[in-house]
Amino acid sequence: RVNMIIDMSHSAEFSTLEAIEISIQPIVVSHANPLFWHQGLRNKSDKVLKALNDSGGMIGFSLYPHHLKDASNCTLQSFCEMIAESTKKISVKQIGIGSDLCIHHPDSIVEWMRNGTWTKTKDFGEGTADNAGFPPQPSWFEDARGFENLHKGLKDVGFSEEETHDILGNNWYNFYKKFD
């Protein structure tokens, strides 16, 4: 076996659950959100959140507009409330931010990613032929300075200072530190 961490962010339900079951160490979903909040193609079910929790895995909540309730119009409060609600399904020590950002990249980058090199057909992911580019970021997270907004938003929905710091980075650090 290879000592690596498996990331199932781009995988469907069955594959994700199978990876959690088969892996000898915890896996991650580095950038997705719960389906209970938004029915995005890559967002994860309560069953996956529970399996991640029980196996010691991690989820990073995504800021990519196609993964967000109300897309680019998602509010900071809604996003932070989703994180708080998620802690009923997965430990606050097993959650983080997985921004999945390509800020200020031209649409040609996403066109290249979706060019269908192997399938020979264009895959628009969660976009469409009419809306194939990068959607605008929510106003509260237009770049890395948005972490200040996340800090405030998490505190506003009831997370302690320690929990907020854990969610904003310490949990990822502690998770990966176990695999040195």
Where are these regions (language model features)?
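A conserved active-site cap/scaffold subdomain adjacent to cofactor or substrate pockets
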Residues: 53-76
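Histidine/acidic residue-rich metal-binding segments in metalloenzymes
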Residues: 1-28, 41-57, 77-93
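Active-site environment of divalent metal-dependent phosphoester hydrolases
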Residues: 11-17, 34-37, 65-69, 103-105
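Short acidic/histidine-rich active-site segments
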Residues: 90-140
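Mid-to-C-terminal alpha-helical segments outside catalytic/metal-binding sites
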Residues: 132-180
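Sec-exported extracytoplasmic/periplasmic mature domains
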Residues: 24, 53-54, 84, 88-91, ...
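Conserved, mostly hydrophobic/aromatic
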Residues: 6, 31, 59, 100, ...
